[in-house]
Amino acid sequence: MTSKLEQLKQFTTVVADTGDLDAITRLKPVDATTNPSLLLKAAAIPGYADLLEQVKADTKGNVDLACDKFAVSVGAGILKVIPGRISTEVDARLSFDEPALLKKAHQLIELYEAAGIKRDRVLIKLASTWEGIRAAEKLEKEGIQTNLTLLFSFAQAQACADAGVFLISPFVGRIYDWYKKSTGKEYIGAEDPGVQSVTRIYDYYKANGYNTVVMGASFRNIGQIEQLAGCDRLTISPELLVQLSDDQGELPRILKPGNAGEAKQQLNESQFRWAMNEDAMATEKLAEGIRQFARDQEKLEALMADKA
């Protein structure tokens, strides 16, 4: 029997949720994703010490540019060992400023292209705010493909699909966390609210012919991953990838095109904002996620300033 990881790869593109180059080289994912929290972790890895010094020297005290160059340099290194794409995140503090999101996305793409990496190997990650979705819609029309992250609600998924974004990252574990804390219950298998959220989105996209890729993210255990086997892509931490690699049990496909999905519904801005207002979990988790990424971005900036 092959491992659960190898079985999963037969019907789902496996993505590594890390900036750890050694882990990526060992686990051989197709794509990789990073975010400010993962970049902060990467900055503490001894193997990146020389890169930090080089970025410091190149940017001459420009902390904002130093953070961007570090993110792109980490991404460029990862692209040398994976066949697919790297997702690099825009500063979360810009999540409600469409023009600023567009400017930062263009800066990141320019840095990648200056490093000899074509834009078709990069996904720009944006928080799934209304402004982030609108920025993504414009970027897609320019040939810059996007990954909409911090996605917790069906309304966010609907708006992303209508905007024609390349890929969404609906979060599983953080939804699970909220419901577990709110109700005091343990959720297992198909009862998991995070699993149910991604399943509903996947079925809706397939039933309505959307091309947007569904990439489940934020997993707490391999049981959640097993319930979403068959999803277009899953981005998984190295720790859980190792667990899947070590498990020789059977892994059946759960998600498949052809399941019944809800009828298409397009949302305008006021409908989107009302739907978010009515979803306490999504509202809280989106705000919390943006705050956490913003704090880690600030820590990365402090590290760059200290290094300078």
Swiss-Prot record:
Organism superkingdom: Bacteria
Transferase in keyword set: yes
UniProt xrefs under HAMAP family: Transaldolase_1
Protein name (Swiss-Prot/TrEMBL): Transaldolase
GO MF: transaldolase activity
Active site (UniProt): 125
Catalysed reactions, as listed in the record: D-sedoheptulose 7-phosphate + D-glyceraldehyde 3-phosphate = D-erythrose 4-phosphate + beta-D-fructose 6-phosphate
